[in-house]
Amino acid sequence: MNKFALVFVPFPILGHLKSTAEMAKLLVEQETRLSISIIILPLLSGDDVSASAYISALSAASNDRLHYEVISDGDQPTVGLHVDNHIPMVKRTVAKLVDDYSRRPDSPRLAGLVVDMFCISVIDVANEVSVPCYLFYTSNVGILALGLHIQMLFDKKEYSVSETDFEDSEVVLDVPSLTCPYPVKCLPYGLATKEWLPMYLNQGRRFREMKGILVNTFAELEPYALESLHSSGDTPRAYPVGPLLHLENHVDGSKDEKGSDILRWLDEQPPKSVVFLCFGSIGGFNEEQAREMAIALERSGHRFLWSLRRASRDIDKELPGEFKNLEEILPEGFFDRTKDKGKVIGWAPQVAVLAKPAIGGFVTHCGWNSILESLWFGVPIAPWPLYAEQKFNAFVMVEELGLAVKIRKYWRGDQLVGTATVIVTAEEIERGIRCLMEQDSDVRNRVKEMSKKCHMALKDGGSSQSALKLFIQDVTKYIA
């Protein structure tokens, strides 16, 4: 067969861009006849400067088989409209690529579009140019299956959203992709509120139009959920091709002096002695919660590295920032009493930190990329979900898979939609940290074994390599 090409359209935030780029690299390494173009939409307003730097680095590394089409800035609407407003530019870019392919006798043939889970309106572009459309799902199979299940129940009139607060509900759901009953109070806001549910229902319906779904997971991590999805008979084939992690140039973390100081300090600590607390680019806390965390860390007696940021007042307009004076916020004398045991920082080079032998546990917001990074480096986690699907991730990691330590079972609020969270007490946090840092716990041993499987999945003959090959085979079947 002759050369063929895929066009990727990722959602324009850093985490999604990174996993898309990593998957594209794996695909072109796997198949020499394949070339990939990645269309990069204007970044969402408020995304940090590191995303711009990352895109610049990608563009500079473009070549004949993997290159990037960066769409220049336009208006910055709300998140929900961002992709839709740029559809005309996506159409023009795809048309240009098709035209470029047709002009060269040795050029590849367009075999399909691969769109992000939040770029489903691009399906219409694929239909217009008469090529298949594939989905790239940047989170896990479990939450994918949950969303599809709820969409199916809703369309059968077997699911509705109550006017009462779902976080107070005692109802549990029987979800085919889970072995454990799933509490309604653990639902992501998008699947449990009248404001957001229509968007996710539409998303689920359009997912079913895809020729296939690439998922950033690996078969050994979610075997039950994958089998459930495959056996349902009414969803496209899922290809578990992860973990898709951007580790290159990050494991040393020495891009600036601050990062270097952090890593040098970690090099001086005993193995598995430091608990690392970090909550992603959107995670932040108010003063009261920060004090409870400080009390817990001091009482636990463990060494710590704490990435602490002030919660954003309006996440649509600004990301979390730094506290002006931590000594006024945290308990009196905290820094003097813990100066030999811990560090409180702002930004943290997360991948480089997790790679250090000194890290013995990770308190995380439970974003999917962070979970995969912790598994890659064999670091057990204690979930502290803050927004989006993270409550589901926390439930699965603790209750379903036994790969995480519980701080508390139920969490309230969502920082993305601005709903109030409940203060987690110092006692709860301290108890969670002590369990997390146990050196021979069942959770730590399970994480160690899963880490080995995580690495094996990406090697020749591994499950994710096999899934990539199967995806490429299926793509070539649909080339007209």
UniProtKB/Swiss-Prot annotation:
PROSITE patterns: UDPGT (PS00375)
UniProt cross-references to Gene3D superfamilies, sorted A to Z: Glycogen Phosphorylase B
Residue numbers binding UDP-alpha-D-glucose: 281, 348-350, 365-373, 387-390
Lineage top rank: taxon: Eukaryota
Example of a GO MF term: quercetin 3-O-glucosyltransferase activity
The keyword Zinc is assigned to this record: no
InterPro entries: UDP-glycosyltransf_plant, UDP_glucos_trans, UDP_glycos_trans_CS
SUPFAM superfamilies (UniProt xref): UDP-Glycosyltransferase/glycogen phosphorylase
Keywords, sorted A to Z: Glycosyltransferase, Transferase
Pfam families reported in the protein's UniProt record: UDPGT
Enzyme Commission numbers on file: 2.4.1.-
Record family assignment: Belongs to the UDP-glycosyltransferase family.
Biological role stated in the UniProt entry: Possesses low quercetin 3-O-glucosyltransferase and 4'-O-glucosyltransferase activities in vitro.
Name of the protein this chain belongs to: UDP-glycosyltransferase 71B8
Gene designation per UniProt: UGT71B8
